[in-house]
Amino acid sequence: MKKLIFLFLITLSCSTSNNKNEGHANHAISDKNQNSLSPHTVAMAMVGGAHIHIDYSSPSVRNRIIFGGLLAYDEIWQSGAHNATWIETDYDLLVNGNKLKKGRYGFFTIPSRGDWTVIFNKNWEQHGKDEYDQKDDVLRFKVKPIILNDIVESLKYDIDEIDENNGLISLSWEKSKITIPFEIKR
């Protein structure tokens, strides 16, 4: 009888451990129940054991010109609506050849006709870009946007695992997409 109970407990333990990362697969959570034109949304994924979390509000195109229209070129944008978008990691990352220490950061961009500027800022808890200060930038670099054939109606972030040490963060909206490769630093 003891052996039977022991085998049952081992089987239960194994099935539970297989599901432990199930909730951390690349996914987005959106609060569609709220009455907002820009619902609060979250993108999360596990990449090589690191938990990457992006918190943002997701505005929609709604038949507007976004980049170079609603959002002027060459001006700071909180990369979402309402509060500044923030990104959190529980491991140090290597982003664009620079170390980004584990923690939570405000995420901003400067859209442009050419390369966009990507910014990780230590002030993550702010409304929009009102309190943005360049002196609080932890990391700033340029990326080349990808022009999409189809319109992405609602702002969307994705986090993809390339392999156990590398991942990719992407932001897509309207007809533009930027990608930010990163490496997990152990």
Task: Spell out what each predicted region is.
Residues 4-12:
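Sec-dependent N-terminal signal peptides
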Residues 10, 58-60, 91-93:
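Short glycine-rich, polar/acidic loop-and-turn segments at beta strand-coil junctions
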Residues 15-75, 124-186:
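Primarily secretory-pathway and cell-envelope proteins
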Residues 76-127:
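Mid-length scaffold segments of soluble, non-membrane domains
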